[in-house]
Amino acid sequence: YRDYLQQRQITRETAEKFRLGATPNGWDSLYQFLKTKKINPQEMLDLGLVSVSQKTGRYVDRFRQRLMFPIGDEKGNIIAFGGRIIDKESSPQKYLNSPDTPLFHKSRNLYGLHLARNKIRNVDQAIIVEGYMDVISCHQYGINNAVAPLGTAFTPEQGKLLMRNTYQVGISFDGDSAGVKA
Protein backbone atom coordinates (compact mmCIF):
# COMPACT_ATOMS: atom_id res chain seq x y z
CA TYR A 1 0.00 0.00 0.00
CA ARG A 2 2.98 2.29 0.51
CA ASP A 3 3.63 2.26 -3.25
CA TYR A 4 0.05 3.37 -3.90
CA LEU A 5 0.30 6.19 -1.35
CA GLN A 6 3.62 7.24 -2.84
CA GLN A 7 2.10 7.30 -6.34
CA ARG A 8 -0.67 9.53 -4.99
CA GLN A 9 1.98 11.67 -3.21
CA ILE A 10 0.48 11.07 0.22
CA THR A 11 3.05 11.72 2.95
CA ARG A 12 3.62 9.49 5.94
CA GLU A 13 2.32 12.26 8.21
CA THR A 14 -0.94 12.48 6.28
CA ALA A 15 -1.30 8.68 6.27
CA GLU A 16 -0.85 8.70 10.05
CA LYS A 17 -3.31 11.60 10.50
CA PHE A 18 -5.98 9.56 8.69
CA ARG A 19 -4.83 6.31 10.38
CA LEU A 20 -4.43 4.54 7.04
CA GLY A 21 -3.35 0.92 7.02
CA ALA A 22 -3.48 -2.23 4.95
CA THR A 23 -4.87 -5.72 5.25
CA PRO A 24 -2.97 -8.87 4.29
CA ASN A 25 -4.00 -11.19 1.50
CA GLY A 26 -4.99 -14.03 3.86
CA TRP A 27 -8.59 -15.19 3.94
CA ASP A 28 -8.99 -15.12 7.72
CA SER A 29 -6.09 -13.13 9.19
CA LEU A 30 -8.29 -10.64 11.04
CA TYR A 31 -10.71 -13.35 12.12
CA GLN A 32 -7.86 -15.39 13.64
CA PHE A 33 -6.40 -12.32 15.35
CA LEU A 34 -9.74 -11.27 16.85
CA LYS A 35 -10.33 -14.83 18.04
CA THR A 36 -7.12 -14.60 20.09
CA LYS A 37 -8.57 -11.45 21.66
CA LYS A 38 -11.69 -13.41 22.67
CA ILE A 39 -13.98 -11.51 20.28
CA ASN A 40 -17.13 -13.48 19.53
CA PRO A 41 -17.55 -14.40 15.83
CA GLN A 42 -21.13 -13.08 15.91
CA GLU A 43 -19.83 -9.67 17.01
CA MET A 44 -17.35 -9.75 14.12
CA LEU A 45 -20.24 -10.49 11.76
CA ASP A 46 -22.44 -7.78 13.29
CA LEU A 47 -19.67 -5.20 12.85
CA GLY A 48 -19.05 -6.20 9.24
CA LEU A 49 -15.48 -7.31 9.82
CA VAL A 50 -16.03 -10.87 8.60
CA SER A 51 -18.57 -12.77 6.57
CA VAL A 52 -19.39 -16.44 6.16
CA SER A 53 -18.10 -18.06 3.00
CA GLN A 54 -20.95 -19.51 0.95
CA LYS A 55 -18.58 -22.18 -0.38
CA THR A 56 -17.03 -23.40 2.87
CA GLY A 57 -19.27 -22.05 5.63
CA ARG A 58 -16.16 -20.64 7.34
CA TYR A 59 -15.58 -17.12 8.58
CA VAL A 60 -13.54 -15.00 6.16
CA ASP A 61 -12.24 -11.47 6.42
CA ARG A 62 -14.37 -8.88 4.66
CA PHE A 63 -11.32 -6.82 3.72
CA ARG A 64 -8.37 -8.62 2.09
CA GLN A 65 -5.34 -7.02 0.45
CA ARG A 66 -6.75 -3.52 0.69
CA LEU A 67 -5.62 -0.07 1.68
CA MET A 68 -7.80 0.66 4.69
CA PHE A 69 -9.54 3.94 5.48
CA PRO A 70 -10.88 4.01 9.04
CA ILE A 71 -14.18 5.90 9.17
CA GLY A 72 -14.68 7.95 12.30
CA ASP A 73 -17.79 9.32 13.93
CA GLU A 74 -18.00 13.02 14.80
CA LYS A 75 -15.63 12.46 17.74
CA GLY A 76 -13.13 10.39 15.76
CA ASN A 77 -14.10 6.99 17.16
CA ILE A 78 -13.65 4.36 14.45
CA ILE A 79 -17.08 3.04 13.51
CA ALA A 80 -16.43 1.48 10.09
CA PHE A 81 -13.90 0.99 7.33
CA GLY A 82 -13.48 1.59 3.65
CA GLY A 83 -11.00 -0.51 1.72
CA ARG A 84 -9.41 0.11 -1.69
CA ILE A 85 -8.08 -2.90 -3.55
CA ILE A 86 -4.29 -2.88 -3.84
CA ASP A 87 -3.91 -5.66 -6.42
CA LYS A 88 -6.41 -4.95 -9.21
CA GLU A 89 -6.44 -8.62 -10.25
CA SER A 90 -7.55 -9.95 -6.86
CA SER A 91 -11.00 -8.34 -6.86
CA PRO A 92 -13.25 -6.64 -9.39
CA GLN A 93 -14.58 -4.33 -6.66
CA LYS A 94 -12.25 -1.32 -6.38
CA TYR A 95 -13.75 -0.02 -3.12
CA LEU A 96 -15.45 -2.01 -0.39
CA ASN A 97 -17.14 -0.40 2.60
CA SER A 98 -18.34 -1.72 5.91
CA PRO A 99 -22.01 -2.63 5.76
CA ASP A 100 -24.52 -0.67 7.80
CA THR A 101 -24.25 -1.83 11.40
CA PRO A 102 -25.69 -0.76 14.76
CA LEU A 103 -22.76 1.72 14.95
CA PHE A 104 -22.55 2.83 11.33
CA HIS A 105 -24.95 4.03 8.67
CA LYS A 106 -23.11 5.39 5.65
CA SER A 107 -25.97 7.75 4.81
CA ARG A 108 -25.57 9.44 8.22
CA ASN A 109 -21.80 9.98 8.26
CA LEU A 110 -19.21 12.00 6.36
CA TYR A 111 -15.65 10.87 5.83
CA GLY A 112 -13.18 13.18 7.54
CA LEU A 113 -15.72 15.28 9.45
CA HIS A 114 -14.02 14.70 12.80
CA LEU A 115 -10.79 16.13 11.32
CA ALA A 116 -12.48 18.95 9.39
CA ARG A 117 -15.07 20.19 11.89
CA ASN A 118 -12.96 22.89 13.57
CA LYS A 119 -11.78 24.31 10.24
CA ILE A 120 -15.32 24.19 8.85
CA ARG A 121 -16.55 26.22 11.82
CA ASN A 122 -13.60 28.64 11.67
CA VAL A 123 -14.04 29.47 7.97
CA ASP A 124 -17.82 28.89 8.02
CA GLN A 125 -17.62 26.70 4.94
CA ALA A 126 -17.30 23.03 4.03
CA ILE A 127 -16.10 21.52 0.79
CA ILE A 128 -17.69 18.24 -0.23
CA VAL A 129 -15.43 16.08 -2.37
CA GLU A 130 -16.10 12.69 -3.87
CA GLY A 131 -14.10 10.15 -1.91
CA TYR A 132 -11.52 9.12 0.65
CA MET A 133 -8.46 10.03 -1.40
CA ASP A 134 -9.94 13.40 -2.34
CA VAL A 135 -10.42 14.28 1.34
CA ILE A 136 -6.93 13.07 2.22
CA SER A 137 -5.32 15.01 -0.63
CA CYS A 138 -7.21 18.19 0.28
CA HIS A 139 -6.11 17.98 3.90
CA GLN A 140 -2.52 17.26 2.91
CA TYR A 141 -2.42 20.48 0.90
CA GLY A 142 -4.06 22.63 3.58
CA ILE A 143 -7.70 22.42 2.54
CA ASN A 144 -8.75 21.14 5.95
CA ASN A 145 -12.49 21.76 5.59
CA ALA A 146 -13.02 18.94 3.06
CA VAL A 147 -15.32 15.97 3.73
CA ALA A 148 -16.85 13.25 1.57
CA PRO A 149 -20.10 11.28 1.51
CA LEU A 150 -19.75 7.55 2.06
CA GLY A 151 -21.32 6.25 -1.08
CA THR A 152 -22.49 7.39 -4.46
CA ALA A 153 -24.78 10.19 -3.26
CA PHE A 154 -24.95 13.01 -0.74
CA THR A 155 -27.94 12.29 1.52
CA PRO A 156 -30.32 14.58 3.44
CA GLU A 157 -28.94 13.10 6.69
CA GLN A 158 -25.42 14.10 5.66
CA GLY A 159 -26.71 17.58 4.86
CA LYS A 160 -28.19 17.90 8.35
CA LEU A 161 -24.91 16.71 9.85
CA LEU A 162 -23.02 19.36 7.91
CA MET A 163 -25.53 22.10 8.78
CA ARG A 164 -24.65 21.66 12.46
CA ASN A 165 -21.30 23.18 11.49
CA THR A 166 -22.01 25.54 8.56
CA TYR A 167 -24.58 26.50 5.95
CA GLN A 168 -21.90 27.42 3.38
CA VAL A 169 -21.01 24.42 1.23
CA GLY A 170 -18.94 24.03 -1.92
CA ILE A 171 -19.05 20.86 -3.99
CA SER A 172 -16.07 19.52 -5.91
CA PHE A 173 -16.86 16.13 -7.41
CA ASP A 174 -14.91 14.51 -10.23
CA GLY A 175 -16.05 15.21 -13.78
CA ASP A 176 -16.48 11.51 -14.57
CA SER A 177 -19.83 9.70 -14.65
CA ALA A 178 -19.64 8.75 -10.94
CA GLY A 179 -18.98 12.36 -9.95
CA VAL A 180 -21.81 13.66 -12.11
CA LYS A 181 -24.17 11.03 -10.67
CA ALA A 182 -23.24 11.93 -7.08
Give the ranges of each region predicted by the language model.
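Terminal amphipathic helices with adjacent charged low-complexity linkers/tails
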Residues: 15-24
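Phosphate/diphosphate-binding loops
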Residues: 175-182
